[in-house]
């Protein structure tokens, strides 16, 4: 007897999003993100805040790569889903900047509606380390 499992479409969307993010594939990210999407990054660093609209969100993402000379990565470890459109992605953020190394686990709660990301909220396992890296 074999067990067949099917991945929820929202989980597949999030997996595609991580690949697109890590390869700076703006075409795919544009397809996956609603034009009015919101992104929320906690903390006290200059990157903390809420970003409204696809262009603002992408500008925020661009800072991650730009401030780290392209070394920033979000290495996906797990994806959890439920039927209401919510997906949780757990990943390890890594980067190098000004002689410092970032290695912080994070989860993002994604709200997916009609096949597009409408809201993303980051939660860091060590918010202090995250903020210190960007200081």
Residue ranges of predicted features:
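A solvent-exposed, acidic/Ser-Thr-rich amphipathic alpha-helical stretch
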Residues: 28, 34-83
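Short, solvent-exposed coil/turn segments at beta-strand boundaries
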Residues: 29-32, 82-85, 110-117
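Hydrophobic/aromatic beta-strand elements that line small-molecule binding cavities or substrate pockets
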Residues: 74-80, 92-94, 105-110
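Short, low-complexity N-terminal intrinsically disordered segments enriched in polar/charged residues
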Residues: 1-35, 135
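Short beta-strand segments that buttress and anchor functional surface loops
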Residues: 62-63, 89-97
